[in-house]
Amino acid sequence: MKYKRILLKLSGEALMGDRQYGIDPKRLAEYADEIKQIHDLGVQIAIVIGGGNIFRGIAGASNGMDRVQGDYMGMLATVINGMALQGALEEKGMLTRLQTALKIEAIAEPYIKRRAVRHLEKNRIVIFGAGTGNPYFTTDTAAVLRGVEVDADVILKGTRVDGIYNVDPEKNKDAVKFDNISFEDVLKKGLNVMDTTAFTLSQENKLPIIVFDMNKEGNLLKICKGENIGTVVNI
């Protein structure tokens, strides 16, 4: 396998499937199947999930809610998603641990880097919830931060499009996809890969990012085997 340890970033919206809100059990089971394929081959897997299918702090702030309060609500939404994914993975026989940046000891371990790494070394899947534990930071930033901390080989950002394009492919049929692109070119072209904080953290730590279509069966396995899927962002 090309990658021994990965950090998989999933958006909360991805868990909605065809719904307008919440969690689609069918989509959850599909993702669990995809993850199981690489888990069974010995890939060490850490996961960060967003919470946008339940609540997004910045959206609450735009409607008059206190931003800090909204962000904490969003963190709790990621914990709900993490619990849902944990249940789906364990139903398929995979040992998992949910670690949260906020202490919620009845349902999750507190995030401790050394403990997370030990779990990964024992082939347990580790799901990181509650973002960074601080307001004003996105789950993309949390994903890169945790990826750097646990020494992941790569950040795999699963989305509903098959890579990075020069313009939005859902709005422009003439959009051109990049197979490989440098961090510098992403910034120069103003491409929307991750928020600036997350992206800069990844660049500074030379942690590559692969943006790919998580909804296409087999993509996750192909990437871990070294096939050219999605767009690779590298130094």
UniProtKB/Swiss-Prot annotation:
Inhibited by UTP. ATP binds at K9, L10, S11, G12, G52, R56, T159, Y165, D168. Keywords: ATP-binding, Cytoplasm, Kinase, Nucleotide-binding, Pyrimidine biosynthesis, Transferase. It holds the Pfam family AA_kinase. UMP binds at G51, D71, T132, G133, N134, P135, Y136, F137, T138, T139. GO terms for biological process: 'de novo' CTP biosynthetic process; UDP biosynthetic process. One of its GO terms (cellular component) is cytoplasm. Its EC number is 2.7.4.22. It comes from the Bacteria. Its main location: cytoplasm. InterPro entries: AceGlu_kinase-like_sf (IPR036393), Asp/Glu/Uridylate_kinase (IPR001048), Uridylate_kinase (IPR011817), Uridylate_kinase_bac (IPR015963). It is found in: Cytoplasm. Pathway: Pyrimidine metabolism; CTP biosynthesis via de novo pathway; UDP from UMP (UMPK route): step 1/1. Gene3D superfamilies: Acetylglutamate kinase-like. GO terms for molecular function: ATP binding; UMP kinase activity. Catalyzes the reversible phosphorylation of UMP to UDP. Homohexamer. Belongs to the UMP kinase family. This is Uridylate kinase.
